[in-house]
């Protein structure tokens, strides 16, 4: 043994430089933690009924030799693990729970070949998911408390994806409330979902309050546009306020998309912000609405439009055609009209 030569192991060292348009996983962890969530680390093995109930996965990947009977499937969603963490905390009287996990899920995909980091037939994307339950704020100066709701967690998703600007569209998910859930899109591509737990699963898990959850593809969360320098505007912006009467079913997203599409060719619109919604009071029996008043089933949406040019100060003659184009498009696509 003493005659064996001392030879240091040799291995190539290759620097892995992350692209500037991508942030690391630890940066994502810090960002979610800064929103008030605590990280959890869970098994990738889950119960069989989680896959059916929460992920809608009719063909999950089954383990040949599970370590326990209740851990017989490879997860295709992180939600079941977070719900189990919530249940554990509530059984120990936790008053407020906000947790997240960053981990892999496992999906069948025949196009995946075997490599150093993949297994044939199994797609293993990374995802980040979060769950919030209890009061929206840990403590308030006035002593009042408000329960966490869909919009609180939706704001967390927007903050996590910033500076990218996601859009949200109503969608159904096996784990989520059909009327309080949405698909998350970035540049028109679906990257995840956010919503309140389905009442059926809330009752099954015996939660006094429905938690709000989100799950996003990690690639979408780590993507970052490279900053581009631009000059400070030299000319003052011009603002116009319009109040548009539309049907109750018209959404904020549909309104904003129509406004931006109407002025895309001109390139003068810098911002559009909804600042007020008015709905008429229900009429009493036998009462008649005043002439020109909003009908039942209608609402008024007030929007502040901001126009600006990089080369000159805008005049009324330049702004008014853009406003007219917006009003015409709102009438043609959404059936809207200016409020009298």
Model regions and ranges:
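Extended, well-folded interaction surfaces typified by the phenylalanyl-tRNA synthetase beta subunit core
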Residues: 1-97, 304-314, 318-340
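A carboxyl-terminal module marker
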Residues: 3-5, 12, 42, 49, ...
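Short, charged low-complexity intrinsically disordered segments located at boundaries
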Residues: 20-28, 59-61, 109-120, 183-190, ...
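Short secondary-structure boundary micro-motifs
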Residues: 37-38, 55, 114-115, 167-169, ...
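Acidic-residue sensor for enzyme active/binding pockets
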Residues: 39, 101, 215
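Flexible beta->alpha loop and helix N-cap segments adjacent to enzyme active/binding sites
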Residues: 47-153
